[in-house]
């Protein structure tokens, strides 16, 4: 892979344009008789394009998405629970959608068609993959304000108590230390009983606060009430709106309309999923080069234009939106906050013990640092990666029920991984990150895609046409590497030819020879 690190930006752009051509091979140009054709021509005129395929950033779903299913008067048949159990996917039914429901969503954007091309001709071609994170940790898991304020106070209190115990013990005379040890030995069973009772209460508290997710059937810890957490989400929403108030795209912008219709279609196709129909989903598109997206627990969807410029087609964007919606539906924010509170409580106990046992403050500070890093890398980050993998699985199923090409989901992460290699970013171990690595996410989705394809069939989605985008991506990468090797070989050959040019050799004439000639003359 050392070849990749020396690539010039022009060659990187050429590869990325080749990746974007994958979308062109699967794009659909509607015939003149299609009712969608005038709307598409209006969008192309808005962007100064002649055909749909000129915009490489976001493309149309060929005969599989919202409008074609509406115009063809197709309905999805129901998925029985028995069929769902055989597939091993979501155990609810495919939603029966009438044309009137979809047309109502289409009427809201009569000025500009919903599935519009969402990038301008000036969209940057290079993907800055390293900064991409779906549902950043701070954005996806708001922590209750009271605990945010009390968290440093709790740590300070634990340090003061532990250090006070140590100073008290060091100040005791030797005879009193022996008396205290004898008292502990005499009452060891009472102390053991007290610790056992505390442990039993902790276990009872833990299991009484477990809830089963209605979507996945997985048990999860919830210490924060849903209503309380929704209130905190509203407060966080106000903070984000204040921050992005000058960067939000207007509602008539084609990129905003595209995302809005995709979110509407995803939620309508999955409104039988617990938590989707009860939530009011509101879209906000932030004009920022950051490659990011997140959904608050109260249904506020934030997506950045940098992400719109990074996806190859609408299929990839549909999966990413499904991933973020899955975070909100599964209650990952409340679950992560609950785990943080539990670990903070246990951490206070260990922190008090560290400051009480360590003989010096410097050793206590070192022990506190080790304890925080162990908590972070053994509990926090692995749990975050688990939640991300679960959101990938459920998001893929949501996209499958919306009749997107689920095969494009793994292609997106392959693109991100290859883009990082092209830019020369170091590959960090996965255990250092809150998210799975791009390569592992692509492999995980590849294992889930067969089930998602079966779910598409059960939901009566149109069959997928054209070659597999994963195969096209691999061929594009292979061709790009071959071209790069040829270019490097040509540069090497030219350099060798230049070095092999005959040079006039200047011979040094000895000084004695010159003197002899002059003497003889």
Swiss-Prot record:
GO terms for molecular function: lipid binding; metal ion binding; metalloendopeptidase activity. It is found in: Mitochondrion inner membrane. One of its GO terms (cellular component) is mitochondrion. CDD domains: M48C_Oma1_like. One of its GO terms (biological process) is protein quality control for misfolded or incompletely synthesized proteins. Disulfide bonds join 403-461. It is an enzyme of class 3 (hydrolase). Autocatalytically cleaved in response to mitochondrial depolarization both at the N-terminus and C-terminus to generate the short active form (S-OMA1). Autocatalytic processing at the C-terminus takes place at residues 443-452. The S-OMA1 form is unstable. OMA1 pre-processing by AFG3L2 may participate in maturation before OMA1 autocatalytic cleavage. Degraded by YMEL1 in response to membrane depolarization. Protein turnover is regulated by prohibitin (PHB and PHB2), which promotes degradation of OMA1 in a cardiolipin-binding manner. May form a redox-dependent disulfide bond. Exists in a semi-oxidized state and is activated by prolonged hypoxia. Disruption phenotype: Mice develop normally with males and females being fertile. They however display transcriptional changes in genes of lipid and glucose metabolic pathways and substantial alterations in circulating blood parameters. Moreover, mice exhibit an increase in body weight due to increased adipose mass, hepatic steatosis, decreased energy expenditure and impaired thermogenenesis. Mice are protected against heart failure by averting cardiomyocyte death in different murine heart failure models. Signal peptide: none annotated. The keyword Cytoplasm does not apply. Its cofactor is Zn(2+). Residues 140-191 are mitochondrial matrix. Protease activity is activated upon autocatalytic cleavage in response to mitochondrial depolarization. Keywords: Autocatalytic cleavage, Disulfide bond, Hydrolase, Lipid-binding, Membrane, Metal-binding, Metalloprotease, Mitochondrion, Mitochondrion inner membrane, Protease, Transit peptide, Transmembrane, Transmembrane helix, Zinc, Zymogen. Pfam families: Peptidase_M48. Binds 1 zinc ion per subunit. InterPro entries: Mito/Outer_Membr_Metalloprot, Peptidase_M48. Zn(2+) binds at residues 323, 327, 388. The stress-sensor region regulates proteolysis and activation. Belongs to the peptidase M48 family. Metalloprotease that is part of the quality control system in the inner membrane of mitochondria. Activated in response to various mitochondrial stress, leading to the proteolytic cleavage of target proteins, such as OPA1, UQCC3 and DELE1. Involved in the fusion of the mitochondrial inner membranes by mediating cleavage of OPA1 at S1 position, generating the soluble OPA1 (S-OPA1), which cooperates with the membrane form (L-OPA1) to coordinate the fusion of mitochondrial inner membranes. Homooligomer. This is Metalloendopeptidase OMA1, mitochondrial. The gene is Oma1.
């Amino acid at each position: 892979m050392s070849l990749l690190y020396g690539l010039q930006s022009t060659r990187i752009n050429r590869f990325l344009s080749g990746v974007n051509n994958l979308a062109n091979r699967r794009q659909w140009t509607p015939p003149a008789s299609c009712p969608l054709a005038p709307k598409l021509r209006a969008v192309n005129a808005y962007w100064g394009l002649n055909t749909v395929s000129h915009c490489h950033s976001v493309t149309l779903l060929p005969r599989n998405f919202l409008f074609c299913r509406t115009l063809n008067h197709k309905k999805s048949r129901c998925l029985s629970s028995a069929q769902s159990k055989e597939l091993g996917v979501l155990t609810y039914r495919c939603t029966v959608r009438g044309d009137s429901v979809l047309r109502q969503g289409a009427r809201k954007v009569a000025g500009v068609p919903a599935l519009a091309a969402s990038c301008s001709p000036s969209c940057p071609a290079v993907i800055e993959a390293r900064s991409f994170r779906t549902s950043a940790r701070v954005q996806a898991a708001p922590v209750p304000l009271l605990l945010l304020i009390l968290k440093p106070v709790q740590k300070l209190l634990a340090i003061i108590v532990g250090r006070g115990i140590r100073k008290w013990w060091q100040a005791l005379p030797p005879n009193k230390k022996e008396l205290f040890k004898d008292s502990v030995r005499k009452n060891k069973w009472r102390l053991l009983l007290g610790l056992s009772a505390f442990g039993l209460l902790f276990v009872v508290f833990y299991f009484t606060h477990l809830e089963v997710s209605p979507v996945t059937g997985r048990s999860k810890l919830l210490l924060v009430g849903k209503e309380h957490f929704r209130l905190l989400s509203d407060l966080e929403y106000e903070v984000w709106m204040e921050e992005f108030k000058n960067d939000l795209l207007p509602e008539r912008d084609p990129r905003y309309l595209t995302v809005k219709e995709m979110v509407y279609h995803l939620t309508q196709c999955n409104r039988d999923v617990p938590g989707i129909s009860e939530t009011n989903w509101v879209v906000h598109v932030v004009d920022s080069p950051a490659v990011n997206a997140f959904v608050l627990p109260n249904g506020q969807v934030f997506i950045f234009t940098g992400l719109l410029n990074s996806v190859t087609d609408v299929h990839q964007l549909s999966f990413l939106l499904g991933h973020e919606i899955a975070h909100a539906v599964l209650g990952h924010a409340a679950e992560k906050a609950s785990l943080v509170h539990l670990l903070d409580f246990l951490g206070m106990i260990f922190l008090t013990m560290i400051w009480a046992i360590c003989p010096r403050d410097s050793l206590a500070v070192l022990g506190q640092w080790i304890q925080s890093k162990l908590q972070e890398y053994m509990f926090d980050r692995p749990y975050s990666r688990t939640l991300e993998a679960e959101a990938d699985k459920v998001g893929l199923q949501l996209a499958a029920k919306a009749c997107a090409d689920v095969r494009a989901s793994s292609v997106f992460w392959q693109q991100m991984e290859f883009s990082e290699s092209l830019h020369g970013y170091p590959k960090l171990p996965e255990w250092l990150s809150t998210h799975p690595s791009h390569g592992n996410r692509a492999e995980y989705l590849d294992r889930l895609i067969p089930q998602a394809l079966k779910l598409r069939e059960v939901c009566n989605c149109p069959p997928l046409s054209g070659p597999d985008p994963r195969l096209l991506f691999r061929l594009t990468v292979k061709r790009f590497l071959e071209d790069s090797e040829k270019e490097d070989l040509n540069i090497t050959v030219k350099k060798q030819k230049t070095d092999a040019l005959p040079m006039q050799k200047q011979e040094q004439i000895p000084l004695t020879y010159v003197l002899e000639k002059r003497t003889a003359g």
